[in-house]
């Protein structure tokens, strides 16, 4: 990429005014300030990236206020690859979601060349014109790859958009920017990082990870997995509210790739929540080009598949954690853990209900051990098996991550007295809420299920950010 700008100095669309509530937060990518000091530790200083994948970004000016910084991104494979994706469950699915689904269905997950993303406009609820714009973006990348499509239904590039809903894309600007980005395709760490930054909206830092690994069939062959994601608000499980692109140079068939992604997403991106809202655009895509060679993964019963499933799931969980750590206005990263539930499904529903409770989240922001709000959320959880929640067997505690003693709030349905000096434990950036159902002696019906959901707190600044989003 030619002279990429430092990612710490990036496009700013709106600046929040400073107030007595604390330091101003910059959203739609920070303006002329560096990434917040507390977030810099999450930005990798180097990376190992999969063979055969090239990335780049360019400025289009999707938002008129953005006069110079990248807002169009490309992730391209030098050869056709297998691809799979998981999409938003929102019924108002954005044009890029619909087009990407069509591309994958028509090609049956094979022969995909990459992904094009724009930030600044979601291209959602934009009618037939929005669909045409998404198809034009896909076709333009194919043209740049030297494999022009024969028609709008024959493209090989997935499309993603993020930003304000209900507005049309400035499509000419984007189509002009795509060749510029394509001419700068590269595989350097700085280019991957700049591309991860180009897809951001309210994020305060680019979310990028990479990981080398081996597989049982080729213990001496190095494979790589890289991924970038964006999201800081409108985040809730069920493939809700974020974009993510994962790439690997392992040879994997489309059917095996889909199974791998579905498993990984259910335990990562579908197990996080920031504000309980589900977006119109969210997509997680996984591309595998096989450029590193070796034995192809074609079935779900092979040792390589099992190893890849573990690696991919762990990797996706790490990416998902970055999204929660960058929650809009967040001051805390919270793990809600449910233990001894009759089933994993029930445990996940209960953990998710706690995670999306505004009262629980505001109490955590205020460093208030208000376990009554946690119990309230447990009590109204929907869709769980009868008898799952037994008040007199319910225990709730806070578990500091620094290894200090667990703060027990409720034990077998009885309030547990605790020292107010432990209140300082609630000021920690990381905290775990543990919910346990106690099994009676000799009983075999409980203890089989557990679930974890990641969430952040609600602060004054979340309201400020979203109240000012379009102003």
Curated annotation (Swiss-Prot):
Q: Which reaction does it catalyse?
A: N(2)-acetyl-L-ornithine + L-glutamate = N-acetyl-L-glutamate + L-ornithine; L-glutamate + acetyl-CoA = N-acetyl-L-glutamate + CoA + H(+)
Q: Where are the transmembrane segments?
A: none
Q: Where is the site Involved in the stabilization of negative charge on the oxyanion by the formation of the oxyanion hole?
A: 162-163
Is the Heme keyword given for this protein? no
Pathway named in the protein's UniProt entry: Amino-acid biosynthesis; L-arginine biosynthesis; L-ornithine and N-acetyl-L-glutamate from L-glutamate and N(2)-acetyl-L-ornithine (cyclic): step 1/1; Amino-acid biosynthesis; L-arginine biosynthesis; N(2)-acetyl-L-ornithine from L-glutamate: step 1/4
- What are the GO BP annotations of this UniProt entry? L-arginine biosynthetic process; ornithine biosynthetic process
Q: Fill in the PTM field for this protein.
A: The alpha and beta chains are autoproteolytically processed from a single precursor protein within the mitochondrion.
Pfam families according to UniProt: ArgJ
Top EC class for this record:
transferase
GO CC, sorted alphabetically, is: mitochondrial matrix
Q: Which UniProt keywords apply?
A: Acyltransferase, Amino-acid biosynthesis, Arginine biosynthesis, Autocatalytic cleavage, Mitochondrion, Multifunctional enzyme, Transferase
Q: Where is this site: Cleavage?
A: 240-241
Q: What residues does substrate bind to?
A: 201, 230, 241, 328, 466, 471
Instruction: Indicate the principal place this protein occupies in or around the cell.
Output: mitochondrion
The record places the active site at 241
- Annotated EC: 2.3.1.35, 2.3.1.1
Molecular function (GO) terms for this protein are: glutamate N-acetyltransferase activity; L-glutamate N-acetyltransferase activity
Q: Which domain of life is it from?
A: Eukaryota
- Compartments, as annotated in UniProt: Mitochondrion matrix
Q: What does it do?
A: Catalyzes two activities which are involved in the cyclic version of arginine biosynthesis: the synthesis of acetylglutamate from glutamate and acetyl-CoA, and of ornithine by transacetylation between acetylornithine and glutamate.
Miscellaneous information on this protein: This protein may be expected to contain an N-terminal transit peptide but none has been predicted.
UniProt lists the family membership as follows: Belongs to the ArgJ family.
Question: What does the subunit section of this Swiss-Prot or TrEMBL entry state?
Answer: Heterodimer of an alpha and a beta chain.
The name this protein goes by in its record: Arginine biosynthesis bifunctional protein ArgJ, mitochondrial
